[in-house]
A protein has these predicted regions:
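A short, structured loop/turn motif at beta-sheet edges
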Residues: 65-73, 94-101, 121-123
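Bacterial signal peptide processing site
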Residues: 17-19
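N-terminal glycine/threonine-rich, aromatic-flanked beta-hairpin/loop signature
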Residues: 41-69
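Positively charged n-region of N-terminal signal peptides that target proteins for export
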Residues: 1-4
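Short, exposed beta-strand-loop hairpins at the edges of beta-sheets
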Residues: 55, 94, 103-115
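C-terminal motif of bacterial Sec signal peptides marking the signal peptidase cleavage site
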Residues: 12-15
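An anionic, turn-rich surface loop/hairpin at beta-sheet edges
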Residues: 76-99
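Tryptophan-anchored aromatic micro-motifs
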Residues: 23-39
Length: 123
């Protein structure tokens, strides 16, 4: 009986905890992003509207079409791809939000290897 009480208590505590995801707050705006790949941190700033995103990184500008699947998932398609990698669409999923940032995971569409990053809303 004692084990049952402990088990039920744990289920109630962990069952009530849910990761905050107010994804619609991050559909549009200006953002700063950091992604770590192979221990190298890549930084960029980007402005996203309902249907387009313009990103600046390493002195380059990249533009993509934006297609929201739901409030927390989006597909990016590069407007003028310069190579085979840029021709692949990217799937991004917001996995957690705070009042000023969101944590995300992303991969090429159909790829199982995912990367994670964080974006901070600037406006």
């Amino acid at each position: 009986m004692k084990k049952l009480v402990v088990l039920v208590s744990l289920c109630l505590v962990f069952g009530c905890y849910q990761t905050q995801r107010n994804c619609s707050d991050y559909k549009t705006g200006t953002f700063y992003s950091e992604v770590s790949i192979n221990n190298v941190v890549y930084k960029s700033t980007f402005k996203r509207t309902n249907n387009m995103q313009v990103e600046m990184y390493d002195g380059k500008t990249d533009s993509t079409h934006v297609r929201w699947i739901n409030d927390c998932e989006v597909i990016y398609k590069t407007i003028h791809p310069k190579n085979m990698a840029e021709q692949k669409d990217i799937h991004l999923k917001i996995i957690m939000t705070t009042d000023s940032s969101y944590t995300f995971e992303y991969s090429y569409v159909g790829d199982t290897k995912k990367q994670k990053g964080i974006a901070y809303k600037l406006d």
